[in-house]
From Swiss-Prot:
Keyword Protease: no
InterPro entries noted in UniProt: UreF, UreF_sf
Protein role: Required for maturation of urease via the functional incorporation of the urease nickel metallocenter.
Highest taxon in the source lineage: Bacteria
Membrane-spanning ranges: none
Subunit comment: UreD, UreF and UreG form a complex that acts as a GTP-hydrolysis-dependent molecular chaperone, activating the urease apoprotein by helping to assemble the nickel containing metallocenter of UreC. The UreE protein probably delivers the nickel.
Keyword list, A-Z: Chaperone, Cytoplasm, Nickel insertion
Annotated GO CC locations: cytoplasm
PANTHER family: UREASE ACCESSORY PROTEIN F
Cellular localization per UniProt: Cytoplasm
Source organism per UniProt: Haemophilus influenzae (strain 86-028NP)
Record's protein name: Urease accessory protein UreF
Segment forming the signal sequence: none
Molecular-function GO term, any one: nickel cation binding
Amino acid sequence: MAQTLNRSLTDLGALLHLVDPTLPIGGFNHSNGLETFVQQRVVESKATLEEYVQTQLLQNWIYNDGAYLSLAFDAMCEGNFDRLCELDWQLSATKVARESREGSFKLGVRLLKIFIRYETHTLLTAYQQAIAEKRVQGYFPIVFAMVAQAMGLSKADTLYAFYYNAAVGAITNGVKLIPLSQMDGQDILFDLRGSLVQAVELSFDPDEEWLGAATLANDIRAMQHEVLYTRLYMS
């Protein structure tokens, strides 16, 4: 009983560390196009921010970052390094907005730099070497999956944590940009609980035919962000 409890708490601690908002990777610097939506007054209220995050969650992330994370987790379980590299290349091709693409691999490289100090795993070492040799970029969802699997976390918990982290980031940025009250942000996060579970279910075994399915409005805003006159975020 005590051994099972200790293992469960250890896993929980590892998961909380992985999604810690104070990790020094620079995630708070990126809005991934949300800043453009706000400046264009498409997202301008509590209701429109919730709709934005809901759309990202169930029409974008489950076919893009979440799906790649899911497949990378499977590749880690199989010890398939070539597959991890292939997913990195595919993700690079499907992230069409330059700022979002560059932001993702910068976050991934920094995340790996932190956790490779604590997790001894041959695939993490090989992947870091591949990044150094510029054979892969090191995208955030792929590194997130690799680190979580190396920690011994479950795939469902990893997906939920990833989506939760992404949703919190979008809500926090929206609250700051619009602006809204902190309580509005908490209400949105509470309302998304069911959608977070749904996202995990939909991307647990992703259909590879849907990988990279485009959300055109978001991709366009992410590109337009490069030329905004004033901006708070890097993407």
